[in-house]
Amino acid sequence: MAARLCCQLDPARDVLCLRPVGAEPCRRPVSGSLRTLPSSLPSAVPADHGAHLSLRGLPVCAFSSAGPCALRFTSARCMETTVNAPRNLPTVLHKRTLGLSAMSTTKIETYFKDCVFKDWEELGEEIRFKVFVLGGCRHKLVCAPAPCNFFTSA
């Protein structure tokens, strides 16, 4: 049986918080396999996760102890950003960045939840990183932008 998750958007940190339904309330991302949930999950992706990999194209906040500006969770084999996201998500997130009226936080949470359930439950995707960038990173890139497969090679 697939895991059911509670999906909450923390607008203060631009972080999508996922936790198993019925688990202790916490506002940190969940990591690990969600097909077979262990009894004790790590509360977040470690700050040094992937630190041995190339930083090409990653923002300077990528390995910050506070976490990167990207929304991370384990799931699909592709990286979804404001550039290649379906529907009107790029426009919505751009408006939010500018402080203009856009899709409500509840609707954004629903959008991400639908993506998570589709990938994990319907498609049975392998456990990989999927990234949703909410309004773009506030930090400069380490070097010139380049195709980044860091999150897709986990």
From Swiss-Prot:
Q: Which GO terms describe its biological process?
A: DNA-templated transcription; symbiont-mediated activation of host NF-kappaB cascade; symbiont-mediated arrest of host cell cycle during G2/M transition; viral genome replication
- Keyword flag Transcription: yes
The source's superkingdom equals Viruses
Sorted alphabetically, the Gene Ontology cellular component annotations on this record are: host cell mitochondrion; host cell nucleus
Residue ranges for the region (Mitochondrial targeting sequence) are 68-117
* Family annotation (InterPro entries): Transactivation_prot_X
Primary location recorded for the protein, binned into one broad class: host cell
Keyword terms of this UniProt record: Activation of host NF-kappa-B by virus, Activator, Apoptosis, Host cytoplasm, Host G2/M cell cycle arrest by virus, Host mitochondrion, Host nucleus, Host-virus interaction, Modulation of host cell cycle by virus, Transcription, Transcription regulation
Q: List the disulfide bonds.
A: none
The compartments listed are:
Host cytoplasm; Host nucleus; Host mitochondrion
Tell me how the protein is altered or processed after translation. A fraction may be phosphorylated in insect cells and HepG2 cells, a human hepatoblastoma cell line. Phosphorylated in vitro by host protein kinase C or mitogen-activated protein kinase. N-acetylated in insect cells.
Q: Which family does it belong to?
A: Belongs to the orthohepadnavirus protein X family.
Biological function:
Multifunctional protein that plays a role in silencing host antiviral defenses and promoting viral transcription. Does not seem to be essential for HBV infection. May be directly involved in development of cirrhosis and liver cancer (hepatocellular carcinoma). Most of cytosolic activities involve modulation of cytosolic calcium. The effect on apoptosis is controversial depending on the cell types in which the studies have been conducted. May induce apoptosis by localizing in mitochondria and causing loss of mitochondrial membrane potential.
Assembly notes: May form homodimer. May interact with host CEBPA, CFLAR, CREB1, DDB1, E4F1, HBXIP, HSPD1/HSP60, NFKBIA, POLR2E and SMAD4. Interacts with host SMC5-SMC6 complex and induces its degradation. Interacts with host TRPC4AP; leading to prevent ubiquitination of TRPC4AP. Interacts with host PLSCR1; this interaction promotes ubiquitination and degradation of HBx and impairs HBx-mediated cell proliferation.
Q: Which HAMAP family match?
A: HBV_X (MF_04074)
Put simply, this protein is called: Protein X
Q: Which organism is it from?
A: Gorilla hepatitis B virus (isolate Cameroon/gor97)
Give the gene symbol: X
